[in-house]
Amino acid sequence: MEDIKEKVLETLASLGMTGWGLTPADHDGFTCAATLFLAYQLPPETDPLAGGSYDEATFHNTLIAVRDRGLQMLQPLYEVLDEAGVRHWTVPSGQDPDTLEAPFSAKRAAALAGLGWTGKCSLLVTPRNGPRVVLFNVLMDLEGAGAPTTLRPACGTCTACIDACPQGYLTGAEWRDGIDRAQVIDAFACSSRMEMLGKPIGHKHSCGLCLLACPLGARKATNH
């Protein structure tokens, strides 16, 4: 099993993702979660941090393209796991419409893997790319993930994401383990508005205003 773990670690490191980490998991019999992310940037003309004007289509299409690219990049990992007979499952994107919760929290797994922290925008914030990342989670029946490693939130007194939300859905509370989501964000109001705005364009509005305002996102990232 140790040889398999080493092969998995080597493969994860070779995929070309912006960042990745392992953390123990306890979900549907899986014991380990590999959390990976790709960082992205927008064209200057549609990037608020570069003086541009937010464009929904550009933001949405960027997310789709980066997600599709990331899923393709995971193929070598699947091959290694399949060859070793290790059961695995890639957590799909999306949430339960009634609870607005995912079947497995990619954000929490990423935080436990030491990749970032949950910011005042209720999204994962990474030290180098802020919240401008697309997350991927592969759950595996693999032992030896190691103890969780968490980062202290580094948002400090920054309120950029809060100020960027035109509806005031962010409260300004700093996320901490065990806090009720409603104390940080009115998730249902936010989701309802994104659905309303999305009707004319045929998909739920992606609305990246809060995450694109994070000053950490100004660091250079390469779209894959």
What does each of the following model-derived ranges do?
Residues 59, 65-224:
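Catalytic cores of enzyme domains
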Residues 1-68:
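Non-catalytic, usually N-terminal nucleic-acid engagement modules in DNA/RNA processing proteins
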